[in-house]
Amino acid sequence: MGTLPARRHIPPWVKVPEDLKDPEVFQVQTRLLKAIFGPDGSRIPYIEQVSKAMLELKALESSDLTEVVVYGSYLYKLRTKWMLQSMAEWHRQRQERGMLKLAEAMNALELGPWMK
């Protein structure tokens, strides 16, 4: 997805400093980020506004995972984490189904492994 610009401001619905303590953290496969957050993270401001949370993405070195950090009040953090994990799982399953259909189509055409 590329490098996201550094955050310049904290959204007005995030209370400083109490909402910045003890964030919810989880990891998402980097290849799913564009599907969840849009090209170059264009959907992040909308997701933050609707969920009343603040998101921060951190690429993990030597891994195909990205760490998602969710700041906000306790319930908003948990709800946002659950929503994003559900979206990631949905997109992962969707991509997996697409790969299975592609494999079936290639088998139906009897393409050899050198064509894959």
Swiss-Prot record:
Family as reported in the entry's similarity comment: Belongs to the KHDC1 family.
Annotated SUPFAM superfamilies: Eukaryotic type KH-domain (KH-domain type I)
Function: Involved in the maintenance of embryonic stem (ES) cell pluripotency. Dispensable for self-renewal of pluripotent ES cells and establishment of germ cells. Associates with specific target mRNAs.
Induction summary: Down-regulated in differentiated embryonic stem (ESC) cells, compared with strong expression in undifferentiated ESC cells.
An example Gene Ontology biological process: regulation of gene expression
Taxonomic path: Eukaryota, Metazoa, Chordata, Craniata, Vertebrata
Keywords: Cytoplasm, Developmental protein, RNA-binding
Residue intervals of the KH domain: 23-84
Gene: DPPA5
GO CC annotation terms, alphabetical: cytoplasm
Xref: InterPro entries: KH_dom_type_1_sf, MOEP19_KH-like
Localization per Swiss-Prot or TrEMBL: Cytoplasm
Cytoplasm listed as a keyword: yes
Protein name (record): Developmental pluripotency-associated 5 protein
GO molecular function, one term: mRNA binding
